[in-house]
Curated annotation (Swiss-Prot):
HAMAP family hit by this protein: OM_assembly_BamC (MF_00924)
Family annotation (Pfam families): Lipoprotein_18
Presence of keyword Signal: yes
Function field: Part of the outer membrane protein assembly complex, which is involved in assembly and insertion of beta-barrel proteins into the outer membrane.
GO cellular component: cell outer membrane
Protein name (Swiss-Prot/TrEMBL): Outer membrane protein assembly factor BamC
Cross-referenced Gene3D superfamilies: Outer membrane protein assembly factor BamC (3.30.310.170)
GO BP field: Gram-negative-bacterium-type cell outer membrane assembly; protein insertion into membrane
Organism of origin: Oceanimonas sp. (strain GK1 / IBRC-M 10197)
Keyword Membrane listed: yes
Compartment(s) where it occurs, according to its Swiss-Prot or TrEMBL record: Cell outer membrane
Coiled-coil intervals, chain numbering: none
């Protein structure tokens, strides 16, 4: 038990984010350069010395010893896709990615979620928030969060500033600002990932356009691609090649047993067991899917009709993509 406690204590002391003082002695601060005059034996002349490169005596600049903070600097990290660190101050630029709501409102909501998840006291003020915070490796401080929209860049900056007085060192203030901003950025990225996961698992409507000889998915290209790649193996297709950038999937249909279709609670897919290519087309908010045989010839209308009878309810089922 004692050994475990010792390990825990040592691990805590060796944390580079919190240990600001070196773990060696500081006797070197009292040391001086010892010099002695050159002794010239009797009968010899003293050598001539070049005095051009003599190091002058001067006062020591900067901190040393126990006062020297050895912690690595904390850097503002753009953890969210479409974000960029500001060139001045502790802040991040976030660029508009979604069109369903204004970015400034979205960031306001994200900051509120961040404060509530971390049990942080906060108040809404003009163009931002004021909050308390305990940053890693820095004393507890008060912070001012400011949102600065830029209509030209279609972006909003989130800048955080420590509002503590002169009792906090400048290096601790900068470290705390960067640490708090990184914590918010990580929280925001997690929330965006959660929302993306919900969207990816949501139902997608799939219909047949008999006139064009293709299927239409009421979702964008990326989500339709993910849904298709997830479902194909479950529906009896072996994927032999896929190229998302080129928009096609090469498969071979091996079929499923009657019992497997009953377990899936889907209409059985009764098409020839052979090689196919599924070609996707990006239509903005919708995606087209066409089916061809191994010779890259469009399949018959009845084959496409049978495919949509099975694939459409599968695209609607959220339990099949979890």
């Amino acid at each position: 038990m004692i050994s475990l406690l010792a390990v825990a204590v040592l691990a805590g002391c060796s944390n580079p984010e919190t240990r600001s003082q070196a773990n060696r002695g500081f006797d070197y601060e009292q040391e001086t350069l010892r010099t002695a005059p050159l002794l010239i034996p009797e009968g010899l002349q003293a050598p001539r010395f070049n005095t051009e490169y003599v190091i002058p005596k001067g006062t020591a600049q900067g901190v040393t010893g126990k006062v020297l903070d050895i912690r690595p600097p904390t850097q503002v990290l753009p953890l969210v896709r479409g974000s960029e660190a500001m060139t001045e101050g502790s802040g991040l630029w976030f660029y508009q990615q979604r069109l369903d709501q204004p970015l400034e409102r979205e960031l306001n909501q994200a900051l509120t979620v961040f404060f509530e998840q971390t049990d942080t006291d906060y108040d809404a003020v003009a163009n931002g928030f004021e909050s308390s915070g305990d940053a890693i490796g820095a004393p507890s401080q008060q912070f001012r969060w400011q949102l600065m929209p830029d209509a030209v860049r279609r972006a909003v900056a989130v800048q955080v500033q420590s509002t503590e007085g002169g009792g906090v060192l400048a290096q601790d203030r900068l470290r705390a600002e960067a640490s708090m901003l990184n914590a918010f950025s990580l929280s925001y990225q997690r929330e965006l990932s959660r929302q993306q996961e919900l969207l990816d698992q949501g139902p997608i409507a799939l219909t047949l356009d008999a006139g064009q000889g293709l299927l239409l998915a009421e979702q964008d290209y990326d989500r339709t691609w993910k849904r298709l790649i997830t479902l194909l193996p479950r529906l009896g297709f072996d994927i032999s090649n896929r190229q998302q950038a080129l928009g096609y999937v090469d498969v071979e249909f091996d079929g499923l047993s009657k019992g497997d279709w009953q377990d899936l609670r889907l209409p059985a897919l009764d098409i020839p067991e052979q090689e196919y290519r599924i070609q996707l087309g990006d239509l903005g908010s919708r995606t087209s899917l066409s089916l061809s045989n191994k010779d890259r010839e469009p399949v018959a209308a009845d084959v496409l009709s049978k495919l949509v009878n099975t694939l459409a309810p599968a695209f609607e089922r959220t339990d099949l993509v979890r």
